[in-house]
């Protein structure tokens, strides 16, 4: 009887140990699961990139954007190249490189590269209607003295919500600290997207794991309307507590397999204004 009890206890202990280890091992295996280029959720809702908010979903995409802002006789142009690269299904990185030039009353007053930003990120929650990604933006002082030369970090989160009927919401929240100026601010944004069109099955492959057509460039031909609000609030210094907001109304379109085009109108929502109006446009290449 004693031997039987001992054997039973050993088996129970082994079972408990396996159970305790299985959860973290399963989580680790999920992070190392191979990347799968998906543009639709498990229930068929399109994943759409907002203009000024990092996505919660992972991908392999190249963005080439140009933004123009004007106010008080000063015009600022910013061209930016951004690469989003997923290493696995849940781990990835974003790299951003801007180039800025200004003119006043039509006369060039300065130009140069902005700072390089590197953003390691991990998809932490992934459900049919909600995604949450944690990230750590690191800004390196690689830009010109006029438009860069700062070191900063910005830990934050990005979220994606499926609101139903092809309405989606991209949102983000981060705390950015600039070391050179010893300044800290809360950075935030929300982007509402309404998608129109029909998913083409010409470029889809069935994912048997979920029984949905979700593969690669299934969003070619879809049209999207964007409404966005982004902003920042200083957490220290003379401007502590001020709210600085800007809005965007834009559209994007799946021009071809692996290529989206987009454009938007920018406007300030709070005073004092940093600019009077602005325009942005660009291309998204999906790999």
Role assignments for model-derived ranges:
Residues 28-287:
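Transmembrane beta-barrel domains of Gram-negative outer membranes and organellar outer membranes
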Residues 1-35, 207-212:
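Cleavable N-terminal export/targeting peptides
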């Amino acid at each position: 009887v004693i031997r039987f009890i001992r054997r039973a206890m050993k088996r129970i202990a082994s079972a408990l140990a396996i159970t305790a280890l299985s959860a973290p091992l399963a989580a680790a295996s999920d992070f190392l699961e191979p990347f799968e280029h998906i543009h639709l959720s498990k229930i068929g809702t399109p994943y759409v990139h907002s203009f000024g908010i990092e996505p919660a979903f992972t991908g392999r995409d190249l963005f080439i954007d140009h933004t123009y802002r004007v106010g008080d006789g000063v015009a600022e142009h910013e061209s930016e190249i951004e690469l989003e690269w997923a290493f696995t299904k849940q781990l990835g990185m974003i790299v951003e490189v801007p180039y800025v030039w200004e003119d006043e009353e039509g006369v060039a007053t300065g130009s140069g590269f902005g700072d390089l930003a590197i953003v390691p990120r991990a998809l932490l929650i992934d459900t049919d209607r909600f995604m949450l990604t944690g990230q750590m933006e690191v800004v390196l002082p690689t830009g010109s003295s006029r438009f860069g030369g700062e070191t900063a970090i910005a830990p934050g989160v990005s979220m994606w919500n499926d609101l139903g009927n092809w309405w989606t919401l991209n949102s983000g929240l981060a705390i950015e600290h600039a070391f050179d100026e010893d300044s800290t601010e809360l950075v935030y944004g929300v982007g509402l997207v309404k998608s129109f069109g029909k998913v083409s099955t010409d470029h889809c492959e069935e994912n048997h794991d979920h029984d949905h057509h979700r593969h690669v460039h299934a969003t070619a031909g879809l049209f999207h309307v964007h409404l966005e609000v982004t902003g920042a609030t200083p957490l220290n210094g003379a401007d502590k507590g001020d709210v600085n907001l800007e809005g965007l109304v834009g559209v994007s379109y799946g021009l071809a397999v692996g290529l989206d085009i987009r454009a938007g109108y920018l406007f300030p929502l709070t005073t004092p204004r940093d600019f009077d109006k602005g325009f942005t446009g660009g291309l998204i290449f999906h790999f």
